[in-house]
């Protein structure tokens, strides 16, 4: 069987937070016994909804009496009048102003496949896979040179998830200072090359060629059944995405912050005897070496076993003797295995690509034992032993 599907529609987005209704209004405050009126945000009476124009096309199929099935979907979303909080100069008295700033296009594919690979009288093997790949491109902006926003900068032809950061250049072997790259310019202010600086404020921003958007992400599952037993697993994965890990940088201070924990990397710090290293020398004053740069930009690809379950369904002749329609015992565990290049604690993060003060424990490993019984006239009865947690 084959089914074709096509859809098109418009969708609005007004995700500006709850403060929008009070923008432009004043609050009465008191400071040192003096009353005053304070405005938190600039009024934006011409601000409009962000509009998303969505197009989807695909096919659903099934083969061999539904033994194999799946779907292929193509989608494109064109967004215009993008909602954006544009940073303002501190001299204006406001941090930012909400604006409709440009247009954006998302294009991608989604694939979902599942099938029964082996099916005999006593044994069955099922397998499922899904993946998503999409690209994100800014197509129009009101300004040629948009301001830097965190670790990103909007630019036509680039993704909103591209990292725009200062680039780490290593450690000066002569004195242990941290180094970053900065541009070299001629008399006409034209960039002619790059050099290094130990002053973080003098370093320039660059597009890194890395993105917080995965090249592909999704999951897969498999299940093996033999007579009444079944073993099933569920995996999630993400490939090609990067993350700026601000959690690990809290352990990368240079010694000027007393009483704080250190990463074990500090054992490889610069000393006169260890000149060629990537960890700067200890200092009594801050040198910004743990500030945002490509040094704390990590590959966040991962593979995680989300769940594994072993179950047993008792034979019908046996359970009918005790007035049950069905009886199943099973043991399951979550998050038993995670493979990741990221030094952080949990690779499953949001699409922003920036973490800070994440929970200080990874996703917990959880295991439990349960039983389910279907009782005629009374419905489903479940019982289980309390779960056990193990924080790896």
Where do the model's predicted regions map?
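Short loop/turn motifs that connect adjacent beta-strands in outer-membrane beta-barrel proteins
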Residues: 1-2, 64-67, 118-125, 138-143, ...
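Solvent-exposed loop/turn elements at secondary-structure boundaries
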Residues: 2-50, 69, 73-104, 147-148, ...
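Transmembrane beta-strands of outer-membrane beta-barrel pores
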Residues: 8-12, 74-80, 115-117, 131-137, ...
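Outer-membrane beta-barrel signature, preferentially recognizing the C-terminal barrel domain
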Residues: 29-69, 97-120, 157-162, 211-217, ...
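Residues on the lipid-exposed face of transmembrane beta-strands in outer-membrane beta-barrel proteins
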Residues: 57-61, 72, 111-115, 220-226, ...
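Conserved small-residue
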Residues: 99, 116-212, 252, 334
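C-terminal beta-signal and terminal closure region of outer-membrane beta-barrel proteins
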Residues: 101-106, 149-177, 266-267, 272-274, ...
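Extracytoplasmic gating/loop element in the C-terminal half of outer-membrane beta-barrel translocons
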Residues: 238-328, 333
């Amino acid at each position: 069987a084959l089914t074709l599907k096509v859809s098109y529609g418009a969708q609005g987005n007004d995700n500006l937070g709850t403060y929008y209704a009070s923008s432009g209004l004043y609050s009465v405050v008191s400071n040192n016994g003096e009353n005053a009126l304070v405005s938190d945000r600039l009024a934006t009476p011409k601000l409009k909804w962000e509009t998303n124009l969505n197009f989807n096309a695909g096919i659903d199929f099934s083969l061999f009496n539904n033994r194999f099935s799946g779907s292929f979907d193509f989608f494109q979303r064109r967004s215009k009048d993008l909602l954006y909080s544009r940073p303002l100069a501190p001299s204006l008295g406001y941090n930012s102003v909400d604006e409709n700033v440009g247009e954006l296009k998302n294009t991608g594919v989604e694939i979902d496949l599942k099938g029964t690979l082996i099916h005999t009288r006593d044994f069955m093997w099922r397998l499922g896979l899904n993946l998503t790949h999409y690209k994100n491109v800014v197509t129009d902006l009101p300004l040629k040179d948009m301001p830097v926003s965190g670790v990103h900068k909007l630019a036509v032809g680039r993704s909103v998830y591209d990292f725009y950061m200062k680039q780490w250049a290593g450690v000066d072997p002569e004195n242990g200072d941290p180094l970053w790259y900065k541009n070299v310019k001629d008399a006409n202010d034209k960039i002619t090359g790059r050099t290094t600086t130990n002053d973080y404020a003098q370093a320039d921003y660059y597009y890194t060629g890395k993105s917080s958007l995965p090249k592909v992400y999704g999951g897969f599952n498999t299940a093996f059944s033999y007579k009444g037993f079944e073993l099933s697993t569920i995996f999630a994965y993400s490939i090609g995405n990067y993350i700026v890990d601000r959690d690990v940088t809290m352990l990368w201070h240079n010694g000027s912050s007393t009483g704080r924990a250190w990463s074990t990397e500090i054992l490889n710090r610069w000393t006169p005897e260890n000149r060629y290293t990537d960890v700067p020398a200890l200092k009594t004053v801050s040198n910004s070496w743990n500030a945002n740069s490509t040094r704390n930009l990590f590959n966040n690809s991962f593979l995680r076993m989300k769940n594994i379950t072993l179950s047993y369904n008792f034979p019908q002749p046996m359970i009918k003797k005790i007035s049950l329609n069905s009886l199943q015992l099973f043991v399951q565990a979550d998050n038993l295995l995670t493979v990741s290049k990221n030094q952080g604690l949990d690779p499953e993060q949001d699409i922003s690509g920036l973490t800070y003060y994440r929970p200080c424990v990874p996703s917990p490993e959880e295991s439990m034992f349960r039983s389910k019984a279907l009782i005629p006239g009374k419905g489903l009865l479940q019982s289980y032993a309390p779960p056990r947690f193990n924080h790896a």
